[in-house]
């Protein structure tokens, strides 16, 4: 019971925080320490919960480089802004697709978290508002054509 309460408290705490890529390293480190503590309790049923929590930390670790030209146009000519936006948005789309794959992989979380729950955690990324559209496009396949 103590382990499940700790798991619930950690999940609740993570959902309250905005977590950056740099903060994800600390989060993963802390989760590993909690996981080691729970392992020392020798309660095997708790293992999958904390393994899923360790995997969950990976969604904050994926760096997505938002295109600067779309936010700040200072000093960039119109023609070059479009070229820069196209090149960086391709990179951003690939990075967002990588994050979408991590979010949608249900086997990764061992049935502890559903895709919707993982998406709820992903919404706590510090850059979520900038990358939300690309991640959802990668997850749900918006813009796909069926031939």
What is each of the regions a protein language model found here?
Residues 1-147:
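Extended alpha-helical "rod" scaffolds
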């Amino acid at each position: 019971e103590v382990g499940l309460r700790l798991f619930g408290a950690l999940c609740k705490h993570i959902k309250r925080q905005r977590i950056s890529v740099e903060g994800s390293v600390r989060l993963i480190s802390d989760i590993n320490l909690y996981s080691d503590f729970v392992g020392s309790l020798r309660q095997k049923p708790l293992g999958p919960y904390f393994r899923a929590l360790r995997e969950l930390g990976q969604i904050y670790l994926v760096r997505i480089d938002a295109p600067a030209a779309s936010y700040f146009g200072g000093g960039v000519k119109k023609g070059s802004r479009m070229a820069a936006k196209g090149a960086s948005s391709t990179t951003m789309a690939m990075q967002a697709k990588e994050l979408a794959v991590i979010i949608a992989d249900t086997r990764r979380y061992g049935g502890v978290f559903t895709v919707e729950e993982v998406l709820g955690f992903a919404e706590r990324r510090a850059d979520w508002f900038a990358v939300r559209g690309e991640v959802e496009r990668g997850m749900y396949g918006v813009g796909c054509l069926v031939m």
